[in-house]
Regions:
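A compositional/biophysical signature of low hydrophobicity enriched in polar/charged and small residues
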Residues: 1-97
Length: 97
């Protein structure tokens, strides 16, 4: 399954409710399962982004549906990146002209 890295920032609402972030992370994992997405890791971070997740989804539509669903709750804004493993890159490079 494709791997995705999601970079998230708390909204004002998310910061006001920061004490609930661990509870929301568990709810996120449950929601992800409903979308067919497996959350591999969740990290809280310092710097430009507040949260980083690594997940696997069957396709872009599943990953996008999850991002829209979680964003609609109003606690975070997200940016999702498609990640490629070394094996993926080996295959890609092998297709180069």
């Amino acid at each position: 399954m494709p791997t995705y890295i999601t970079l998230a920032n708390f909204t004002d609402q998310g910061v006001r409710n920061a004490k609930d972030t661990l509870k929301r992370a568990e709810a996120f994992k449950d929601l992800a399962k409903k979308h067919g997405v497996t959350v591999k890791d969740i990290y809280w971070a310092q710097g430009r982004y507040d949260i980083v997740t690594i997940s696997e989804a069957a396709d872009e539509m599943a990953a996008t549906a999850l991002a829209l669903s979680i964003g609609g709750q109003g606690n975070i804004r997200t940016e999702t990146l498609r990640a490629f493993s070394a094996e993926d890159m080996k295959t890609t490079i092998g297709k180069m002209a």
